[in-house]
Amino acid sequence: MGHLPQSLYSAAGPKFPYPGSSGLGVDQRKLTWSRFPVFLRCASTESLTSLTQNNAAEIELKYLVSQHGWDVRRLNRDDEDEIRRVSLVQAEAFHIPLALFDDFFFMFFQAEVLSALLYKLKNSPPDRYACLVAEQTSETETLSSSSVVGVVDVTAQTESSVLRYFPGVEEYLYVSGLAVSKSQRRKKMASTLLKACDVLCYLWGFKLLALRAYEDDAAARNLYSNAGYSVVETDPLWTSTWIGRKRRVLMSKRFS
């Protein structure tokens, strides 16, 4: 099992700063290595069931998914620079710019994101939480932590507010914190990250993925719909009257 760099080990457990949103620049307001890491060159029609025929040949391969010019793998817990890079990608995606002292507040926001990431890496079993990172496919260069330009979190959960819609299901994987660097958006990286979540769901033996998006974030909802997610519920109307609160939709994707 991997470990965190000693200099990053003492992290508090803050509330994660961006529940139910995606860092795709549309609306800025959920294994150490798996025992079965998969290198999957995905076609749009390829199903997860095909993986059962190839596990033996794929056990030693590094990436969960490789498509559209992106490779997706698990975050390297031993790489302090990579951990900080991931927190920067997420902070830049979810930070809401301010008119005054923006740099100052961004610094604190990034520190909060980093603290939340460290807490989850330190306290979550390796088969219950994974931070997946995307980097550009390169066959000639050695990629460094600075090459990480996309990230998504996947966490095993048992919230009754979600499971009540799925009788017989005891737990699910929650997808959150999907973030893509501004310079790399509209290049199908987010779709590739979501495909990696599908693969991880299969490898861990789960049958259900869930996530939340803002109701008025059409781009994010279209992304999730195209990835196979469907709306399960929408927040009640009265929630939109709360100051600073926007209505969200719960979306899910189920595997047979």
UniProtKB/Swiss-Prot annotation:
Keywords: Chloroplast, Plastid, Transferase, Transit peptide. GO terms for biological process: N-terminal protein amino acid acetylation; peptidyl-lysine acetylation. One of its GO terms (molecular function) is N-acetyltransferase activity. Residues 106-256 form the N-acetyltransferase domain. Residues 1-41 form a transit peptide. GO terms for cellular component: chloroplast. It comes from the Eukaryota. Its main location: plastid. Autoacetylated. It is found in: Plastid, Chloroplast. The active site is at Y224. Expressed in green tissues. It catalyses: an N-terminal L-alpha-aminoacyl-[protein] + acetyl-CoA = N-terminal N(alpha)-acetyl-L-alpha-aminoacyl-[protein] + CoA + H(+); L-lysyl-[protein] + acetyl-CoA = N(6)-acetyl-L-lysyl-[protein] + CoA + H(+); N-terminal L-methionyl-[protein] + acetyl-CoA = N-terminal N(alpha)-acetyl-L-methionyl-[protein] + CoA + H(+); N-terminal L-seryl-[protein] + acetyl-CoA = N-terminal N(alpha)-acetyl-L-seryl-[protein] + CoA + H(+). Acetyl-CoA binds at L178, A179, V180, R186, K187, K188, M189, A190, S191, D217, A218, A219, Y224. PROSITE patterns: GNAT (PS51186). Its EC number is 2.3.1.255, 2.3.1.48. InterPro entries: Acyl_CoA_acyltransferase, GNAT_dom, N-term/lysine_N-AcTrnsfr. The keyword ATP-binding does not apply. Oligomer. Belongs to the acetyltransferase family. GNAT subfamily. Protein acetyltransferase with dual specificity triggering both N-alpha-acetylation (NTA), with a preference for leucine, methionine, serine, valine and to a lower extent threonine and alanine as substrates (can also use glycine), and epsilon-lysine acetylation (KA) of several plastid proteins. This is GCN5-related N-acetyltransferase 10, chloroplastic. It comes from Arabidopsis thaliana (Mouse-ear cress). The lineage of its organism: Eukaryota, Viridiplantae, Streptophyta, Embryophyta, Tracheophyta.
